[in-house]
């Protein structure tokens, strides 16, 4: 299965989402390959840390650029899951990956700048479905505010905006801005692999995302 993590705005946590999905799927016992198709190479940097620390389970990682559709189809023949991290803004990598993906998870912040790209995403989805009719796309609310006085209002505003785009499914799972997501990177870990109680909220968020998109 090809899982594409992408959106048209920088900064919503695409790489963080891809990393934690890859780890979560590997911990379920799947053979997972990450595909880093973003020139910032955050996925690759994290993977290098993981190799240095010799963390198990192993996750394969490849880099790709340009038209990556054939690369992804070839990887899909070898691995249970291919998790793809792409650059945004209608990049060649994003567009060509969408043609062959099984699932797209589209991280978005609850900000005007992020939400202003939803119309573009909707048009992309319509075009992908002309060639890939079984493609599923989920909008994922990311980097939410954990402040109790803001949290519910922010989520309500996100859902209200998305209600204007019923063609796009919105995940119930929400990712919040939490320190464990950052702390796990230099150790080559996903938050599910962190020890201690401080990561419990982040772990629950990843588990909810996993169970919603990839129910056991």
What is each stretch, according to the model?
Residues 2, 6-8, 12, 21-88, ...:
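P-loop/Walker-type NTP enzyme "switch/lid" segment
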Residues 118-131:
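Conserved C-terminal guanine-recognition region of P-loop GTPase G domains, centered on the G4
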Residues 145, 158-191:
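Beta-strand-loop-alpha "switch" segments that mediate conformational coupling across diverse proteins
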Residues 17:
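Hydrophobic positions on the alpha1 helix immediately C-terminal to the Walker A/P-loop
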Residues 182-203, 207:
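Inter-lobe coupling/hinge region of RecA-like P-loop helicase motors
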Residues 34, 84, 106, 139-141:
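Structural beta-sheet core signal
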Residues 93-112:
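Inter-motif core of Ras-like GTPase G domains
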């Amino acid at each position: 299965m090809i899982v594409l993590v992408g959106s048209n705005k920088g900064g919503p946590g695409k790489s963080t989402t891809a990393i934690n999905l890859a780890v979560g799927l590997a911990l379920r016992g799947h053979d997972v390959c990450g595909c880093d198709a973003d020139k910032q190479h955050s996925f690759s940097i994290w993977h290098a840390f993981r190799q240095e620390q010799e963390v198990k389970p192993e996750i394969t990682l490849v880099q790709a650029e340009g038209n990556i559709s054939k690369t992804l189809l070839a990887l899909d023949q070898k691995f249970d899951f291919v998790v793809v991290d792409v650059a945004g803004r209608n990049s060649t990598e994003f567009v060509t990956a969408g043609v062959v993906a099984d699932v797209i998870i589209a991280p978005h912040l609850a900000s005007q700048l992020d939400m202003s790209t939803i119309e573009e995403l909707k048009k992309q989805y319509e075009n992908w479905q002309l060639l890939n009719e079984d493609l599923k796309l989920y909008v994922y609310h990311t980097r939410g505010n954990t402040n109790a006085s803001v949290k519910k209002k922010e989520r309500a505003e996100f859902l209200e905006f998305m209600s204007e785009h019923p063609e796009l499914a919105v995940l119930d799972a929400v990712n919040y801005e939490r320190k464990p997501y950052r702390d796990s990177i230099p150790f080559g870990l996903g938050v599910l692999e962190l020890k201690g109680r401080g990561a419990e909220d982040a772990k629950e968020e990843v588990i909810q995302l996993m169970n919603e998109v990839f129910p056991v």
